[in-house]
């Protein structure tokens, strides 16, 4: 499970990890935007995007596939959902926080990124700063992407997964 604020680099890392390992990538932004596309831009997705992610994770894990959950996971209830799926399916969960400690760099990423998701509006830098973030006492580690090549960050992520798994 990769957690982090918008602009931290978690989706980029999740894609690279999926490409490297063959794990199924579950990106909550996709599910949430699909719900908005189907129900209108003002539709309040609430926790429904996460519920879709949990259901898909369960499905793939029961088939013996590895899964990468790419979501903000800013609060404990979101993380608890992923943990419950891991417990239910008898699989291990590895929780890693992705951060960008350089706020200017994170803001630049948000201003210039291509989401690859039809209809998804960009997160504004000021909205990133307003986000609630609850510390995760069960995190296996943190990858700071600030000022670093993505390949180095992927290497750090792979090391954390190997150490924990």
Where are these predicted regions, by residue range?
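Conserved substrate/cofactor phosphate-moiety recognition/catalytic segment
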Residues: 8, 12-65
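Conserved phosphate-donor/acceptor-positioning beta-strand/loop module used by diverse small-molecule
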Residues: 89-110
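Glycine-rich phosphate-binding loop used to anchor ATP phosphates in small-molecule kinases
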Residues: 48-93
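Small-molecule kinase domains that catalyze NTP-dependent phosphoryl transfer to phosphate-bearing small molecules
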Residues: 115-156, 163-165
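Hydrophobic anchor at the beta1->P-loop junction of P-loop NTPases
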Residues: 2
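Conserved nucleotide-binding/hydrolysis micro-motifs of P-loop NTPases
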Residues: 30-32, 99-105, 149
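P-loop (Walker A) phosphate-binding loop of NTP-binding proteins
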Residues: 5
